Amino acid sequence: NSITYNFENINSNVDNGNQSKNISDLSYTDQKEILEKIVSYIVDISLYDIENTALNAAEQLLSDNSVDEKTLKKRAQSLKKLSSIMERYAGGKRNDKKAKKYDTQDVVGYIMHGISTINKEMKNQNENVPEHVQHNAEANVEHDAEENVEHDAEENVEHDAEENAEENVEENVEEVEENVEENVEENVEENVEENVEENVEENVEEVEENVEENVEENVEENVEENVEENVEENVEENVEENVEENVEEYDEENVEEVEENVEENVEENVEENVEENVEENVEENVEENVEEYDEENVEEHNGI
């Protein structure tokens, strides 16, 4: 299938009375003879070249984005079969003319079947062409007729519109001139009255807005000035009052602290004096008692 796909699109230069023809235009016998020669040349090349030829053909044929997956699978199967046949020719059966002949005939048979199938499809397409041509011609006639009708209708409408427009313009110009004069007089009077009323209203609104703005500005300025004056006065008064209060509080606190300190000092001095007096008295009494005791003992001893 892969090979027939290529034969459909390739022109083969065949020496037939010095004329170049497409292989698909030849008779069945001529096609078979040419293909047998081609396959015979293929099976005589080396195994390395066969592998590269099959690989390159597979890459080109299987990378065609215009076919579906089913067609690609069929191509792959055909390439696989052709590759296996080529490998046998390159192996031990290279000189086996009988096997070569039968294998060549098998390959050519597959190719010829594909070509005949393509020819049938092309014949069917050619037979269906007149029907399509007639159908397309009728469709085009209807389409062109509709377009021409629409086009003529548009042109007629535009032409009539232009003529009517010119007539209407002349009539309208006269009416417009008359209406303009009347409207000018009426509009002058109305505009004068309206402008007077509008100007009065606008002036009143502007005066009211200016009054409000001035009142707000004056209020803000007065508030700021009063606040500053009141702050200064309050600061001075508060400072004086706080100084006097702090002085009085400080004097009272100091007097209380002095009294407390005096009481504490008196108590401490009394305790210290008592302790000192006790110690002194004890020492003096001890000394006196010792002296008295010694004198008494001396007297008793002498009396004995």
UniProtKB/Swiss-Prot annotation:
Membrane topology: Peripheral membrane protein
The organism's place on the tree of life at top rank: Eukaryota
Biased composition (Basic and acidic residues): 142-159
Chain residue ranges for the region called Disordered: 142-304
Coarse class of the protein's main subcellular location: membrane
Positions bearing carbohydrate: N18, N22
Record-linked Pfam families: DnaJ-X
Keyword vocabulary terms for this entry: Cell membrane, Glycoprotein, Malaria, Membrane, Repeat
Compositionally biased spans, kind Acidic residues: 160-298
Cellular component aspect of the GO annotation: plasma membrane
Record-linked InterPro entries: DnaJ_X (IPR026894), EMIR (IPR052423)
Cited function: May disrupt the normal intermolecular interactions of the cytoplasmic domain of band 3 and thereby facilitate the invagination of the red cell membrane which is necessary for the formation of the parasitophorous vacuole.
Name of the protein this chain belongs to: Ring-infected erythrocyte surface antigen
Species, as recorded: Plasmodium falciparum (isolate Palo Alto / Uganda)
Recorded name of the encoding gene: RESA
